C-alpha cells in the first residue's frame, strides 16, 4: 500500500529526547516499511526514517526558537499533504482534529489516531461537526467522553521488543519519575511519596516552554530536598539503566491519561 504518516511538528520523528506521539509514529512507520509498504512520512526535517521523508518544517518546533506560532507550520503541513493526497491509498494523521475540515472534502481514505485527552468540553462541538471523520483511540477509556465520534477501533501503543533491555547487574536503589513536568503529571506528588517512603527519587523529565513558570514556581523549590535528584531529559539509550536502577516507577497523574507510554516502558 501507499501510506502517508502525518506527524506533529513539535518533535522530530523519532524524538531526540522526550516525545510520546512522535516515538509511536516512528515505530509504526518503520514497521510498515519493513512489511514492504510504500510509506511517506510527513514530519520535521530533522526526522530520521527508512520511509520517504517529506519535511514540512526544517526542524522540530521545540528546537526552533524562531517559531512563536506553532499553528502556522501545521497549516503549511496540511496544505503540503493535500496537494499530494491523491497519490496515496490511505493517509494516517496524528494531528488530533486538525485534518478534519480538509479531509472531509477530499476523496482519499484517511484515519486519525487521537493521542491526547478528549474530556475537554470544547471538543464536543468539533466532533459533532465531523461525525464521519474516522478516528482511532489508544485506549478504550480515552474515547468515553466522545461516544458520538466515528470510532474505527482502539490500537494500544506498543514498543519494539528489543528497545529496552533490563540490566540485571544494576541494583535497584531509588524511585523513578520519567516523562514531562507539568501540573497534571504531579511530580510534586512523586516527591512527597518518595519522602514518605524514605527512598531517594530520581526525576528524568523535560520542561516545555509552556510549563517553565510552573517548574520555576512550584517544582524547582522542591528539588532542594536531599532525597531528590533532578536529571532532566534523557534519551532512549539512557532509559534501560535509569529504569533498571529503580525499585518502582512513580506515575501519580492527575488527569485522564489517554494511555501512558512510560508505564509499559517500565
Q: What annotation goes with each model-predicted range?
A:
Residues 1-265:
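Catalytic cores of nucleotide-sugar-dependent glycosyltransferases that transfer UDP/GDP/TDP-activated
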